[in-house]
């Protein structure tokens, strides 16, 4: 991160809404990390505290992002990882977080992890599997 202090600044969604009459329930969401591997592979991370569920709307957004990447001819994976850092003044390091579930462009459904892998291990495995460059 180029500016860690700026990273601690919240982007607030209050007051943000779409003005179309049929979209009053559309809410903004965030993504914790996104890696684009040379416009061929998209890796998206969502980190949750101690097994907290990913909200339904956020899951839908991740699914659509992966589906859109697939439609554009890319391999893509959304990875939900868990952390146990309760102190909000303490940083959370993505590389060592344990992956809980994934949504891939190959399967287009959420699947729990079959074996224990860190975020870094899973991202590297996915790139090794699908990157041909």
Kindly give the residue locations of the regions a language model identified.
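Acidic-basic catalytic patches of nuclease active cores, encompassing PD-(D/E)XK
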Residues: 1-29, 119-133
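Nucleic-acid nuclease catalytic cores
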Residues: 69-98
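Helix-rich interaction surfaces within compact, conserved domain-sized segments
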Residues: 91-133
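Conserved catalytic cores of phosphodiester-cleaving nucleases, focusing on short active-site segments
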Residues: 33-35, 42-50
């Amino acid at each position: 991160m180029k500016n860690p202090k700026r990273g601690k600044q919240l982007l607030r969604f209050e007051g943000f809404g779409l003005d179309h009459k049929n979209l009053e329930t559309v809410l903004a969401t965030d993504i914790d990390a996104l890696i684009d591997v040379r416009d061929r592979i998209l890796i998206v991370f969502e980190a949750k505290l101690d097994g907290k569920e990913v909200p339904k709307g956020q899951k839908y957004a991740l699914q659509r992002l992966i589906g859109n990447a697939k439609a554009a001819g890319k391999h893509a994976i959304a990875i939900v990882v868990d952390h146990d850092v309760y102190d909000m003044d303490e940083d959370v390091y993505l590389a060592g977080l344990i992956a809980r579930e994934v949504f891939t462009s190959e399967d287009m459904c959420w699947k729990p992890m079959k074996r224990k892998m860190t975020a870094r291990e899973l991202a590297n495995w996915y790139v090794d599997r699908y990157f041909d460059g």
